[in-house]
């Protein structure tokens, strides 16, 4: 599984994910809620590890910045997920090469360790 390749602490990431559930859920293909509450502002995060950015089915509110990153080949590797979760706008601006671009995710994790833990948690739910 992809999760086994992630270096963060998934258990610690579950606690950090509580901040993410305002906007995100993790629901499997059968609709079972694995994490989160009712947040649907952002995409369902189930199965995103290892997938192209901006590719969650039935989610049509990706920012132009995220779609530009998708068009440039962004894949949610551990490294990319951690960097994005830590600082979403800085990551997208750097990836796209446009310092003026902004995504929809307003804030990131408190630090890189927390971001790594959240990434590991999300990947562990696949």
Predicted regions and their residues:
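C-terminal capping alpha-helices of c-type cytochrome domains
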Residues: 74-126
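Periplasmic/extracellular electron-transfer cofactor-ligation site
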Residues: 6-10, 14-74, 88-99, 124-126
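Boundary at the C-terminal end of the N-terminal hydrophobic targeting segment
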Residues: 1-5
């Amino acid at each position: 599984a992809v999760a086994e390749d992630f270096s963060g602490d998934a258990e610690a990431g579950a606690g950090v994910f509580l901040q993410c559930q305002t906007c995100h859920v993790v629901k499997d293909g059968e609709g079972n809620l694995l994490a989160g509450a009712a947040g649907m502002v952002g995409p369902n995060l189930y199965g995103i590890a290892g997938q192209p950015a901006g590719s969650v089915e039935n989610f049509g509110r990706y920012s132009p910045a995220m779609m530009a990153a998708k068009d440039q080949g962004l894949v949610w590797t551990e490294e990319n997920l951690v960097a994005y979760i830590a600082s979403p706008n800085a990551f997208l601006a750097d990836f796209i090469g446009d310092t003026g671009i902004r995504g929809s995710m307003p804030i990131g994790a408190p630090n890189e360790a927390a971001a790594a833990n959240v990434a590991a948690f999300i990947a562990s739910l696949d």
